[in-house]
Amino acid sequence: MQQLIAEITKGQLKTDLPSFRPGDTLRVHVKVVEGTRERIQLFEGVVIKRRGGGISETFTVRKISYGVGVERTFPVHTPRIAKIEVLRRGKVRRAKLYYLRNLRGKKARIKEIR
């Protein structure tokens, strides 16, 4: 049974993903279906969490939109994601950056890896 599940999920995994970690700034191209039309919507922000493995792996991206913090969680291998771009590599010492939720302005900045 376990082998059957592994074979099925193997075909669903994406192979064209860039490597990214918490602290990196991403631009996620998401396919949005509105009625019969399909368009690409961009979501740009900092990765605050990456969890799971295999087909069930997810990551959470946080951005500030009009002064309000917005977090969106994406499955890594979903067909709804058209493309993931890594804009900046951030240097952080934690795997989960939940502390960014309480920081505002310049305190919420992350150092960039050169």
Swiss-Prot record:
PROSITE patterns: RIBOSOMAL_L19. One of its GO terms (biological process) is translation. GO terms for molecular function: structural constituent of ribosome. InterPro entries: Ribosomal_bL19 (IPR001857), Ribosomal_bL19_CS (IPR018257), Ribosomal_bL19_sf (IPR038657), Translation_prot_SH3-like_sf (IPR008991). It comes from the Bacteria. GO terms for cellular component: cytosolic large ribosomal subunit. It holds the Pfam family Ribosomal_L19. Keywords: Ribonucleoprotein, Ribosomal protein. Belongs to the bacterial ribosomal protein bL19 family. This protein is located at the 30S-50S ribosomal subunit interface and may play a role in the structure and function of the aminoacyl-tRNA binding site. This is Large ribosomal subunit protein bL19.
